[in-house]
């Protein structure tokens, strides 16, 4: 991790970017929308559009606006009440952005996504095509998770993750995560006066995640761990990430002019194909298979398929075609992919050569547990 005072922000050269705005930046301390703040973001994005940049906005704030409209002072804990607030608030959020962008002659579109939309390959491709069509038409897409219909089990999670998934979906050059923090520190600056600000690092650097997971670390406070993981996801499509304070004056336009603000996490990880991104990020894991050292070497260094002889344990229950994680002998995930046999059948054929599959199961659909075209190395 280094600081480079001569660097130019990656946003300056980006032609397509995703901007994620946290709820604290568009609401009055959680008490409904701050229309002036919404107008401010619209003005900055309009300026980026005049520079020829395509921008997709991922914006929080629907639940806070819904609570204000419903007269609720306390955030409900019941899922259906939260979903009701999101449904009411989404109307206000869209109206506010529509009015703000109209001041600059721009149209907006609402895109609500769920995990199931992105897990289904056809719906995933359709969402991708729709977003590309909107950008070609000069429309500013405003994306949020469809909180009204999702459950805890199928949530995408936080909007940092959603921002990264949308970044990969549209093959954006950069992801800008705007928050109420300056960026990343090597420890919590509120507790450690000697905390060092991290201006530049590599997305996916294990040191960042180690700091985030360490005891007493502030880097995970305020959702910074989710931002680090979002940057790692975005890097697999070649997108750089900037984590910056939305309190900075005209932060988006200054980034676009090349000024380095906040923490920049550069993409140096191997770029995955669109299909492998879909496999890694959009399909829910259904189980795990533990591999021996030889199988791990074959997957990671030789680009081979996973054979049953290399599996030493099966964890969880899954069916043919589900996404299953491959775990190395130390317990770390090394790959994931679409499995060709159910968990029950996999348990019967593990540690066996492929030539024995038909004898054990009565037939053989595939000689591999996972074909190399249907797996991605993590």
From Swiss-Prot:
Keywords: Amino-acid biosynthesis, ATP-binding, Cytoplasm, Kinase, Nucleotide-binding, Proline biosynthesis, Transferase. Signal peptide: none annotated. It holds the Pfam family AA_kinase. It comes from the Bacteria. One of its GO terms (molecular function) is glutamate 5-kinase activity. The keyword Acetylation does not apply. InterPro entries: AceGlu_kinase-like_sf (IPR036393), Asp/Glu/Uridylate_kinase (IPR001048), G5K_ProB (IPR041739), Glu/AcGlu_kinase (IPR001057), Glu_5kinase (IPR011529), Glu_5kinase/COase_Synthase (IPR005715), Glutamate_5-kinase_CS (IPR019797), PUA (IPR002478). Substrate binds at residues 60, 147, 159. The keyword Acyltransferase does not apply. It catalyses: L-glutamate + ATP = L-glutamyl 5-phosphate + ADP. Belongs to the glutamate 5-kinase family. Catalyzes the transfer of a phosphate group to glutamate to form L-glutamate 5-phosphate. This is Glutamate 5-kinase. It comes from Bordetella petrii (strain ATCC BAA-461 / DSM 12804 / CCUG 43448).
